[in-house]
Amino acid sequence: MQAGVSEIFSSIQGEGKYVGCRQLFIRLIGCNMDCPYCDTDKLAHSNLVPCVLEKCEGYEGDLELKNPLDLNDIMPYINYRLQQPHHSISITGGEPLLYPQIILELAKNLKPLSIPLFLETNGTLVKQLAQVIDEIDIISMDMKLPSDIGKAYWQEHEEFLKLASKKDVYVKIVVSNESTVEDFEKALSIIKNIDENILLVLQPITPLGGLHEASPEKMLKWQTRAMQVLKNVRVIPQTHKMMNQL
């Protein structure tokens, strides 16, 4: 199966539970959503852009590949980069669960290396998660607030989290000035009803797409409220942007 891959690079995870960990990022093209604050929206719906492989010392293969491509086209580069230590491989996007077969093939190829697979997802494609969950080690699941994106995905999020809770999963909620308390309470209720021990990460929005930054007071108030319901709540911004990392 072919897929659109926009880039592969080694960098620091800047969000969520594993912030600061070194990962090899495989960014897939395509998404089933259109969030206004998306920072990869230019790559979300086009296979016309080439796949760019980060330049690294000693690698002699092509660093720009035509999309869509086969997994065999990028495995030599992935194997070369993994000669250096990495915490895990981040499969990100876009929405990587649009390509469950690619994820399964990747897991099969990487099994001899025993490196964890880290899935970054918008938490809506339940059937696709069911296809790959046995091969995934860590799940970073977004829970989208309707007040920010203009549409509710509560049923999808609930079903997704029930399945994902079998793994090392945490939920990330982007918080803007426009995010409503009603949406937040709904999200808390869903998480609590599945497992109050699931980590919730509140991520202050990096202003984009007409949404505005949440105040420090709002972030503290929302964390306080979440801690009354859940056992583990953290506020973590997009730290990679502070460090000028990809």
List the model feature ranges, each with a label:
Residues A3, Y37-E135:
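Conserved Radical SAM active-site core
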Residues C21-F25, C35, D41-L43, E54-K55, ...:
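General N-terminal targeting signals
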Residues Q2-A44, L48:
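N-terminal pre-triad scaffold of radical SAM enzymes
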Residues F25-I29, S46, C51, K55-G58, ...:
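Solvent-exposed, non-transmembrane amphipathic alpha-helical segments
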Residues Q13, M75-N79, K192:
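Generic structural signal for well-ordered alpha-helical scaffold segments
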Residues P85-S88, L97-L246:
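Conserved AdoMet/S-adenosylmethionine-binding subsite of the radical SAM
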